[in-house]
Amino acid sequence: MSNTDASGEKRVTGTSERREQIIQRLRQQGSVQVNDLSALYGVSTVTIRNDLAFLEKQGIAVRAYGGALICDSTTPSVEPSVEDKSALNTAMKRSVAKAAVELIQPGHRVILDSGTTTFEIARLMRKHTDVIAMTNGMNVANALLEAEGVELLMTGGHLRRQSQSFYGDQAEQSLQNYHFDMLFLGVDAIDLERGVSTHNEDEARLNRRMCEVAERIIVVTDSSKFNRSSLHKIIDTQRIDMIIVDEGIPADSLEGLRKAGVEVILVGE
């Protein structure tokens, strides 16, 4: 009897083999989705979630709503694409974005960092008026094209296709003559002691520059990013003015943020 299926992939005969294949997919793709894996292996979504929970305990993956991402420390060279990130936590990102966009009032000058959560904020700004918005995200800028009442500024610079974001000296210099009311900052990892961090050095440098020219730093994220640390630090946790996050945030992280003087806005799905 053949040990391969119709696609030529080795047939999974047990839990260990299935988990090994999931690890391979994480390393190849950067992310996986529960429903896809359930259909692929012919097991329940509960079984797949248990697999992902096991991999998270092993430090291989970090769970998110709808799937999981590869840990940066496991495969530093793998970064999920914008498309992969967009497929995860979509409902939660939209809830976070809805809370964030309510903070933007006529006359405000805002920075929208690149990312999938800030993209959702941009989508909700279509009816805003008398707002100036600068971004380094190509997908964010495209979403703002339909917001006729928003004056759009781009940082320019070198384009990272993987994240659809601009970076570099030109991007950093474009910020130096501006002062903004608020920055909406998307992040890859948050740790109370190690601060806010990301996997890309160039983006971390640009993010630090954004923080310098913004009156308020507002982090928009989901709870899966907590108790994680990526290679390149952006800022200390204490520098965050506000964080908008889902109710799944770990209790110790929530307590620590509030003790640090960070205003926390909790949202449901």
UniProtKB/Swiss-Prot annotation:
Coiled coil: none annotated. It holds the Pfam family DeoRC. Gene3D superfamilies: 3.40.50.1360, Winged helix-like DNA-binding domain superfamily/Winged helix DNA-binding domain. PROSITE patterns: HTH_DEOR_1 (PS00894), HTH_DEOR_2 (PS51000). Keywords: DNA-binding, Repressor, Transcription, Transcription regulation. One of its GO terms (molecular function) is ligand-modulated transcription factor activity. It comes from the Bacteria. Residues 32-51 bind DNA. InterPro entries: AgaR-like (IPR047779), Carb_Metab_HTH_regulators (IPR050313), DeoR-like_C (IPR014036), DeoR_HTH (IPR001034), NagB/RpiA_transferase-like (IPR037171), Tscrpt_reg_HTH_DeoR_CS (IPR018356), WH-like_DNA-bd_sf (IPR036388), WH_DNA-bd_sf (IPR036390). Residues 15-70 form the HTH deoR-type domain. Disulfide bonds: none annotated. The keyword Nucleotide-binding does not apply. The keyword DNA-binding applies. GO terms for biological process: regulation of DNA-templated transcription. Probable repressor for the aga operon for N-acetyl galactosamine transport and metabolism. This is Putative aga operon transcriptional repressor. It comes from Escherichia coli (strain K12).
